[in-house]
Every structure is written in structure tokens, then in C-alpha cells.
Regions:
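Conserved N-terminal glycine/acidic-rich loop preference
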Residues: 12-22, 39-40, 74-76, 126-129
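Catalytic nucleophile-elbow at a beta strand-turn-alpha helix junction centered on a G-D-S/GDSL motif
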Residues: 32, 83-86
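Radical SAM/AdoMet-radical enzyme domain recognition
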Residues: 59-80, 88-179
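A C-terminal junction/extension of Radical SAM enzymes
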Residues: 177-215
């Protein structure tokens, strides 16, 4: 009697990844200037001394990029990072300039440490597709931070827009991280716990402590 052999199942192989909608994707670090000095953040990505680029300089950077790419006739997807973008007084005017111009911009995403005012984020939420807040326990004011997150989450309704929290997995703050994730889950707010690469850290330990008053 012959026996039938089961076919060997092969692991699926990714051949090609394509976007669901073609676009020109730009990650724009508008400057290294930051109002926080996190111990694990490399000097290339933050400092507290460099000058903020003004609105005209930022406009010129965009115009240069746009002139080189617009003939592709594709929408633009822009992700802003820093430094801390909201620390630059020209950032909100830049977003308004981009949205009010005839630039075929489909999406704008912003990463922030949450240190700007609630009113600022309420204005920003009307102009962008998504805001990602990041927790940094050396500087965080927990209750204020999560109050802002909750308010913005109510404004940015999925799937058209999104609010997200990057919980930084700081080794000294694990107990608070459990509190953060529990609170975010209860509020039905999108979050992820982000691992940290300490290779380029500027200090070997945290020297500051934020205000721990959540819960």
C-alpha cells in the first residue's frame, strides 16, 4: 500500500512591498534644537543651542524639494521630526503654508514630545493627518501630558486621522510604563512600547525626573 506524503509547507517569501497608494514620501527633520535633553538621544538628533530655521528658510527647503519632484504628479506624504518641532515658532505657520498651497499634499504626520500647549495641539490637529506623542520620563509632566493626549485623540478620529503615543521603554521607568499602557488601553488610545538604542547615549543614567502624578 502506498502512502500519501503531505506536501512540505514553505515559509512565505516577501517578493515585493508596494504602497496601497503611490506617493512621494518625505521625512523632514526641521532642526536638531530640542527643549528636552534625554540621556539616550544622540547629539546628532538633539541639542539645546542651535538656532531654529525661520519660516523663509523652511519654505525655501520645501520649494527646492518640490521643484525637483512635482513632475512625478504624485501626492506628498510628509513626516516631521526633530529635535522638537513644536519648539520652533515657525513650525505651525509652515504647516499652514503647506496646506494652503497648491502642493498636492495628501498626508502630514508629526512626532512631538508633548511639551506644547493643548491649544497648540488643537490647532495642529486641524491641519495634519496624525500626531505621535512620545513619553520621556526625565521631563514628562504625566497628568498634563496624558490630558493633552486624551483631548487630541478625541479630535483625531480614525481612520481619517490618528493620534498615537510612543511609550519609550526606559529601563529605569518600567513601573510607570505599565501604568501608561494600562491607562492608554483603558482610554482606547493607540500606543506602542518603543525599544531604545543606548549606543549613542549622552549619559549612562538619567539625571532628571519629571512629574509623576498619573493615577
Amino acid at each position: 500500500m502506498s502512502t500519501l506524503k503531505r506536501p512540505t509547507l514553505r515559509e512565505p517569501t516577501i517578493i515585493k512591498v508596494v504602497p496601497t497608494v503611490e506617493s512621494i514620501s518625505l521625512t523632514w527633520m526641521i532642526g536638531a534644537r530640542c527643549n528636552y535633553d534625554c540621556m539616550y538621544c544622540p547629539v546628532e538628533l538633539h541639542d539645546m543651542t542651535s538656532s531654529h530655521p525661520n519660516l523663509e528658510k523652511l519654505k525655501n527647503v520645501w520649494k527646492s524639494f518640490y521643484q525637483k519632484t512635482h513632475k512625478q504628479n504624485l501626492p506628498y506624504k510628509i513626516s516631521f521630526t526633530g529635535g522638537e518641532v513644536t519648539a520652533n515658532k515657525s513650525f505651525l505657520p509652515l504647516i499652514k503654508y503647506l496646506q494652503n498651497g497648491n502642493f498636492n499634499i495628501s498626508q502630514i504626520f508629526v512626532t512631538t514630545n508633548g511639551s506644547a500647549s493643548l491649544r497648540y495641539y488643537q490647532q495642529l490637529a486641524q491641519l495634519v493627518s496624525g500626531i505621535s506623542f512620545s513619553t520621556h520620563s526625565e521631563f514628562i509632566k504625566e497628568q498634563e501630558f496624558f490630558t493633552k493626549v486624551s483631548a487630541i485623540n478625541q479630535l483625531m478620529i480614525r481612520p481619517e486621522r490618528s493620534c498615537h503615543v510612543n511609550v519609550m521603554n526606559e529601563f529605569w521607568n518600567r513601573a510607570r510604563i505599565e501604568l501608561y499602557t494600562k491607562w492608554l488601553a483603558e482610554q482606547n488610545i493607540s500606543y506602542s512600547v518603543n525599544e531604545i538604542n543606548y549606543i549613542d547615549q549622552i549619559r549612562t543614567y538619567p539625571i532628571l525626573q519629571g512629574t509623576y502624578n498619573l493615577g
